[in-house]
Amino acid sequence: MTENGQFLDYKNVFQENRGAMHDGRLQLLKEKIVFKNNKTGKIDSIQQNDLHSALWRRVARDFELKFQMNSGQVFRFDGFKEMEFERLKDFVKNYYKIDLEHQELSGKGWNWGTTDFEGNEMMFQVGQKLSFEIPLNNVSQCTQNKDEVTMEFHQNDDSELSLMEMRFFIPPSQDEMIDKVKDFHDNVMAKADVLQVKGTAICVFQDLQCLTPRGRYDIRMYPKFIQLHGKTFDYKITYTSILRLFLLPHKDQRQIFFVVSLDPPLKQGMTRYHFLILLFYKEDDLAVELSLPDDEIEERFGGKLQKDMSGPMYEVVSRVMKHLVQRKITVPGSFKGLNGVQSITCTYKASSGFLFPLERGFMYVHKPPVHIRFDEIAYVNFARGTTKINKSFDFEIETRSKNNFVFSNIERDQYASLYDFVHNKQLKIKNIGKDGADFDLMVDSDEDADVHDPYMERMKQEAAEREKQVDDDDDDESEDDDFQPETNVAEVEEEYNSDVGSASSGASDEEEEDGEEEVEEKPKKRKKEKVMKERRQKETPGKVKRKKKDPNAPKRPQSAYFLWLNENRGRFKAENKGISVTELTKLAGKEWKKIDPDEKQKFERMYQKSKVKFDAAMKEYKSQGGGRTSSSPAKKMKMKSPKPSKASSSMVSPSKFKSKEFITESDSLSSSDSDAEVKSKNSPPADEESASESEAASEEEESD
């Protein structure tokens, strides 16, 4: 709640609509009361001069504020705390010149009592106290029987539980001239929202093309509702259920969409139509005559409508609809796309259509139609495919309620205009990088996708940066840690062992070598797996280990803010029952900014005292040897030093088994391990020599 001398602002208030509670924002201003529905965006405005009475009473959801207007219309708002009564009472008294009365309800639970009709409501009273009340505009039908009256109610799809009907038994009167049942029925029907076709329509539009629901309909305009008469179905739409009107030009500039937003929607079986979409051709003309007398037309519409009207069909229909429904018509605003078109061709849910960027939202037509207000949008996202032949991108919208809308196959040439529009409307863009390069990459793309694809270039650049980062991490490691003589010997063995089979010849030699390889194959594989595992561990950048907290170290003092929060946490929970930890923290942060500096200074002094004690305790703790950590010497060895061959060879055990690839003639003649190793690297293996000798011998035998 925000309080100011000029207004009261409540951001978490609920309005009842045919059994469903819709959350929204309520503002009590000096001259009017405004409520905005968060779901539909509909704004209800109550002028100060139209207020008749105001009531405050206890209901299931905290407390309720009820306003009744001079016309009998009623507005109810739930979700107030009991402590708000005095503040609201003073505000209503000072600015609206009416008293906010506290009304007590009857809780006896009796099902008999008396009824009273006041305004648009029927009140059921028990013992001179109100038990319940029924808004008569929620009644869809009322029938009378001998001693009973049955009331049926409109249903709301958003309501989990709905009241279907109520029956009232009315005992007969002793006076035969008075029929109480009929009087009760007439009082209900006088205010009920029953759509009955009585008299002639104000005007009729014949054979209009309708995209949703699909077909051709005759549209009849009555004083309180619209009737759509088709070959198969009939629909009735009350003027109060119409939220918005849109007049949107087709891309070909020859057709016009006229869109009517509905809440509650039209129903056809299990199908719901939240939008009525009519399609007009600009060259079609229409002449219509209103059935109202001239003086009534002048009084109701103030010269904005005439008895006889003619012109383009879309202009006449939209003009009559606007003044009968009393809703403004929304048209495209400042957005100009490719070739000056005010719409964007795209695909939504496998159907092609048009996306219209409007001044306060986006409208997509026509299958299925979608309207997204800017205040519903959490962020937008520009995405595109990775193929080189793709010359389009996707426009994604995520709402605050976590609903995603993806409009795909948008031409790349539309990107610049759509990006500028989104940026000017200050919508959050999800995928803008730290360098802001996404816009340039899309706009500067060559038209020939085979020549240059900036998206692929960006992906390659990011991959190169990641590889460079991994290489930098590898360079930081010490070479001494990597040096393992035994592993190096095993690697050399594997390198030379791979060519042994190809160097040998003769059946007997191959059989012998195959037998030896079977024996040695398993340990060699295990060595190879171990080496590869160590390599992978080396290539993977190591994780930064968090330093373990010393349990014996003195605890740091809390800041002034947390000292204040701990002292006031109980008060926040008491004032806001059921509040989450996140919301409590936000609320506390806002109040901390607003508190008096002297109050803040009090907690600052408490923090300084605690800090002095902490510094002294930490000094004593360190003087006793606390907080010291030992570092491994291996991590400190970062300098590269040359390694002599003797040092490396001496680390290999003389009794270490060597495969026959390493045994050369020099091994039997030289006593130095280093000489043997050098020769084994520079001279071919012994098996290769023996293999060549055996080949030569076999050639001689064949020649003989």
Curated annotation (Swiss-Prot):
InterPro entries found in the cross-reference section: HMG_box_dom, HMG_box_dom_sf, PH-like_dom_sf, RTT106/SPT16-like_middle_dom, RTT106/SSRP1_HistChap/FACT, SSRP1-like_PH1, SSRP1/POB3, SSRP1/POB3_N
What is the native source organism of this protein? Answer: Ciona intestinalis
Q: So what does this one do?
A: Component of the FACT complex, a general chromatin factor that acts to reorganize nucleosomes. The FACT complex is involved in multiple processes that require DNA as a template such as mRNA elongation, DNA replication and DNA repair. During transcription elongation the FACT complex acts as a histone chaperone that both destabilizes and restores nucleosomal structure.
User: Per UniProt, which keywords does this protein have?
Assistant: Chromosome, DNA damage, DNA repair, DNA replication, DNA-binding, Nucleus, Transcription, Transcription regulation
Location, primary (coarse class): nucleus
Q: Which family does it belong to?
A: Belongs to the SSRP1 family.
Q: How does it assemble?
A: Component of the FACT complex, a stable heterodimer of SSRP1 and SUPT16H. May also be a component of a CK2-SPT16-SSRP1 complex, composed of SSRP1, SUPT16H, CSNK2A1, CSNK2A2 and CSNK2B.
Biological processes, Gene Ontology terms: DNA repair; DNA replication; regulation of chromatin organization
Basic and acidic residues compositional bias, start-end: 460-469, 531-542
MF terms (GO), sorted A to Z: DNA binding; histone binding; nucleosome binding
Q: What is this protein identified as?
A: FACT complex subunit SSRP1
Per the UniProt record, the lineage of the source organism begins with:
Eukaryota, Metazoa, Chordata, Tunicata, Ascidiacea
Annotated DNA-binding ranges come to 554-622
Q: Where is this region: Disordered?
A: 460-562, 618-704
Record's compositionally biased regions (Low complexity): 498-507, 644-656
**Keyword Metal-binding among record annotations:** no
Q: Which gene encodes it?
A: SSRP1
SMART domains from the UniProt entry: HMG, Rtt106
Per the record, its GO cellular-component terms are: FACT complex; nucleolus
